[in-house]
Amino acid sequence: MRFLTAGESHGPELLAIIEGLPAGLPLSEEDINPWLEKRQKGYGRGRRMVIERDRVEFRAGVRGGRTTGAPVALAIKNADFKNWAEIMDPAPGNWPRKRALTAARPGHADLAGGMKYGHKDLRDVLERASARETAMRVAVGAVALKLLSLLGVEGVGYVPGMAGVWAKVPFSWDLVPRIEESPLRMTDPEAEAEAIRRIDQAKAEGDTLGGIIEARFRGLVPGLGSHVHWDRKLDGRLAQMALSIPAVKGVEIGPAFENAMKRGSEVHDAIYWSPERGFYRETNRAGGLEGGMTTGEELVVRAALKPIATLMKPLPTVDVVTHEPKDAARERSDTTAVPAASVILCALSAIVLAQAYLEKFGGDTMEEIQERVERYRERVRAY
């Protein structure tokens, strides 16, 4: 399974083409739209989320509520485009255009992208570099999550800590309903209240906040990924996908950075066997991956999200046309997007996992894949 996305932050729409989905996957807009809604929620979001009401539209590859085996094409309209139609007009015109951006914003792709492509209007960089692009990748991830759900896999994204506040209530699958109702997707109401207070303070001071996001999956078969070649190692693929999320600057599988400061005897998960459970582990400090492959335990992917780079009290910069000092431009932005980023991390991790299932089990139809996965589960149980 592979996919491409296209579209700008203030263009008419976002697009995706997904190739390699099996025929017969039950799929409707309502399998995708709830995930788009989750991405738009979260305390600390900006005015853009008031304007947009993201809804996916199928353009190809789905008929009668099922995939046909052909490429699936998705579209999400940008409601804000009506306010930017002249600025984003693809027709030839004289430069500079309205709302041209020449003062590179620190922490953004503006300057490096301008240098790379020779743009003097840095809007040609920021429009594609914007996190708005993740709306379509979440839609693709929702398709992957639908496929995984039919293979017995469940996923969730949440926030273990943000704004300098850590949740003291550990994650449990029983807390998923609480997470889904939480404005910060946190497990701990007290920590959440303090984080909200800090978000309000940062907003009043024209500042931004980051945090830690985590995606968890259960029900995975062991053996997804590979130890044979470096580029098939699942932890490497998950890390690459996580680091492709705008503002993510670090990733770990399980408590990796904590593990790094301990002895091996304190870190590695002992293996047990019983007739009822087969092979199992009492701990999961490996985060569900060993040797680049799933172990069958819960998969835990954690990422660090830096504070959003667009500040209401902008940092000093330089105009790329005049080379004169300037303050960075103020583009509409969030105070924090950590809760939304946890949804994005879950959706994007699901894409990698769906790809791993399709690579391992193959099959042109959903029924074929389900049969092959079940036979594999039986073989693993008998091992």
Curated annotation (Swiss-Prot):
Domain of life of the native organism: Bacteria
Catalytic activity: 5-O-(1-carboxyvinyl)-3-phosphoshikimate = chorismate + phosphate
Record SUPFAM superfamilies: Chorismate synthase, AroC
Record keywords, A-Z: Amino-acid biosynthesis, Aromatic amino acid biosynthesis, FAD, Flavoprotein, FMN, Lyase, NADP
Cofactor(s) listed in the protein's UniProt record: FMNH2
Binding site for FMN: R128, A129, S130, G291, K306, P307, I308, A309, T310, R332
Binding note for cofactor: Reduced FMN (FMNH(2)).
Pfam families hit by this protein: Chorismate_synt
Binding site for NADP(+): R39, R45
EC numbers for this chain: 4.2.3.5
CDD domains the UniProt entry points to: Chorismate_synthase (cd07304)
Biological process according to GO: amino acid biosynthetic process; aromatic amino acid family biosynthetic process; chorismate biosynthetic process
Pathway membership, UniProt: Metabolic intermediate biosynthesis; chorismate biosynthesis; chorismate from D-erythrose 4-phosphate and phosphoenolpyruvate: step 7/7
GO molecular function per UniProt: chorismate synthase activity; FMN binding
Residues annotated as transmembrane: none
Enzyme class: lyase
InterPro entries assigned: Chorismate_synth, Chorismate_synth_AroC_sf, Chorismate_synthase_CS
A GO CC annotation given for this chain: cytosol
Subunit composition and interactions: Homotetramer.
HAMAP family, alphabetized: Chorismate_synth
Family membership: Belongs to the chorismate synthase family.
Its job: This reaction introduces a second double bond into the aromatic ring system.
Protein name: Chorismate synthase
Gene this chain is encoded by: aroC
